[in-house]
Amino acid sequence: MFRASSFHTIDPKGRIIVPARFRDDIRAGGADGVMVSILDKALYAYTFNEWQAIEKKILSAKSEPMRRFKRFFLGNACECLCDKQGRILIPPSIRAYAGLEKEIVLVGMLDHFEIWSREQWDRENNLMEEELEKKEVREAIASLGL
C-alpha cells in the first residue's frame, strides 16, 4: 500500500526518483514499473496488477461521459518502468498536463500514488483546508471514525 508523501525534483529529462518504500509496493504489484495517467491536474501511478483491475472496471462503462473519460484516462496512460537507479521517466505530454517542472510531490493513496507539481499540491492542500470548514465534510470524515 502506498502511504505518506515525499518531496522530490524532476530532472531535465523528466525522470523522478521513486522512494524505496514505493518501489517495494510497485514490485509487489506485478512488475518493476507503473502505469501512469492524468487526472485532476496530477499524474496517477498504478501497479500493473491494479491497472488491470481498473481496465476491467472501465471496460463496462458505456455512457457517453464515460466513453469520453476512457479516451482521456486510457488514451493518456503511459507505461513507466523503473531504471536501475529507481527512477521512472515521465513522458513530456503528461508532464506538461500536470505542470511538472522542478519541484514535485509524490503522494501515497493506498492503491496508487499521485505525482503533483509542488505548486499545484500547495493549492490542493489549501482547498482541503477550506473544505474542512464545511460541516458536511467534517461529518463525512467523522463517519470514517477519524
Curated annotation (Swiss-Prot):
Keyword presence, Signal: no
GO molecular function term, any single one: DNA-binding transcription factor activity
Pfam family, one: MraZ
Cited CDD domains: MraZ_C (cd16321), MraZ_N (cd16320)
Localization (cell): Cytoplasm, Nucleoid
Swiss-Prot/TrEMBL GO biological process terms: negative regulation of DNA-templated transcription initiation
GO CC term (a single one): cytoplasm
PROSITE patterns hit by this protein: SPOVT_ABRB
Keywords from the UniProt entry: Cytoplasm, DNA-binding, Repeat, Transcription, Transcription regulation
Domain SpoVT-AbrB: 5-50, 77-120
First-listed, main subcellular location of the protein, grouped into a coarse class: cytoplasm
Keyword Transcription: yes
Family: Belongs to the MraZ family.
SUBUNIT field: Forms oligomers.
PANTHER family tied to this protein: TRANSCRIPTIONAL REGULATOR MRAZ
NCBIfam families: division/cell wall cluster transcriptional repressor MraZ
Protein's name in the database: Transcriptional regulator MraZ
Protein's organism: Desulforapulum autotrophicum (strain ATCC 43914 / DSM 3382 / VKM B-1955 / HRM2) (Desulfobacterium autotrophicum)
